[in-house]
């Protein structure tokens, strides 16, 4: 079915749908009875958006694990915060899974420290430890922060799979009993609720990312890097200072967008539809939050690449971190001069979306 007055976006332009199909040798999809109504009145659209959201959110989580390990390598942190015994003391699957993922990623790294080797059998006479005994939460509490996000994404996957294998039509025809059941299987509350939870989870992931960026860029906090990872002339060049403004404002936007749609409902249709799910709105807002998160994470990976070059620790990284560093440097070379970075951010986003670690 393709009416002559229907329009579609094709290659970034609004075009006549029939013309686009003809030019590409495609035939219009022929819908059967009730299929069109199901697409517009059921949960199909919101569920489809939700599944795409889930795919990109899961990839974000894996990248956040990678970034968190690389941050701890840069900071030369103690590795016991990701220890199996420590994280199994909390009976949450997500926390344990994140810690296990971090241990796998950090394997072979010469950057992280073992507390038993550094502190247990040595006499320390200094009154103030130069190296923090317990790093900042954004470095040390990663399993506890990303763990609930892992659990939520697992739950979202279960809900979405249940939904796409469900009948969201109304009424439901049962040929076995020869009954027609009038109900509300079109209602999208499951998807709306799950997309709200997903966007809250991704916002928290983005907040962690932003705090790690702040650690990376704040020389008085990290104590080992120049301000804003500036590899140029201090006082003359800016490093990634301007990019931090983008990361901070984008994270703030995510926080505002995290207000749930699930609890918003405006009656319509002569009050027949007196309480609705707003599920498509929820899914679209979650999509925006995810896109924002990729932008913030892109800036973090740019900063980490600069930091690794400044510290000259390429050969001490874990094999996984070294591979990511080299892949990034293949399209984002080290820089010292002040130039616009929006193209590099876009390239980094494209890399993060295409690669799967």
Task: Please provide the spans of the model-predicted regions.
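C-terminal auxiliary extensions adjacent to catalytic cores
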Residues: 4-357
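Basic, glycine-rich
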Residues: 1
């Amino acid at each position: 079915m393709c009416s002559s007055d229907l329009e579609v976006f094709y290659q970034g332009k609004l075009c006549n749908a029939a013309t686009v199909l003809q030019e590409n040798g495609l035939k219009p999809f022929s819908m059967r009875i009730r299929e069109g109504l199901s697409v517009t009145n059921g949960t199909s659209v919101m569920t489809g958006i939700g599944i795409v959201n889930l795919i990109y959110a899961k990839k974000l989580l894996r990248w956040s694990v990678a970034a968190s390990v690389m941050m701890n390598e840069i900071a030369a942190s103690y590795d016991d915060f990701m220890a199996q015994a420590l994280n199994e003391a909390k009976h949450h699957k997500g926390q344990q899974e994140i810690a296990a993922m971090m241990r796998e990623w950090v394997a072979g790294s010469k950057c992280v420290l073992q507390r038993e080797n550094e502190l247990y059998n040595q006499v320390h006479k200094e009154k103030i430890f130069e190296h923090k005994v317990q790093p900042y939460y954004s470095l040390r509490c990663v399993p506890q922060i990303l763990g609930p996000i892992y659990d939520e994404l697992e739950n979202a996957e279960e809900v979405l799979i249940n939904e796409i294998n469900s009948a969201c039509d109304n009424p439901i025809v049962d040929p076995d009993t020869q009954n027609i059941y009038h109900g509300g299987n079109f209602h999208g509350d499951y998807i709306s609720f799950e997309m709200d939870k997903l966007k809250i989870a991704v916002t928290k992931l983005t907040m962690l990312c932003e705090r790690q960026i702040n650690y990376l860029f704040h020389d008085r906090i990290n104590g080992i890097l120049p301000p804003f990872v500036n590899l140029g002339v201090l006082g003359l060049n800016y490093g990634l200072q301007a990019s931090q403004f983008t990361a901070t404002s984008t994270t703030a936007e995510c926080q505002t967008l995290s207000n749930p749609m699930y609890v918003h409902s405006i009656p319509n249709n002569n009050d027949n539809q007196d309480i609705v799910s707003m599920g498509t709105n929820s899914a679209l807002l979650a999509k925006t939050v995810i896109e924002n998160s990729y932008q913030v994470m892109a800036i973090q990976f740019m900063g980490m690449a600069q930091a690794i070059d400044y510290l000259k620790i390429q050969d001490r990284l874990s094999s996984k971190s070294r591979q990511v560093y080299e892949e990034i440097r293949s399209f984002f070379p080290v820089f010292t001069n002040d130039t616009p970075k929006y193209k590099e951010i876009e390239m980094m986003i494209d890399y993060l979306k295409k690669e799967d670690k």
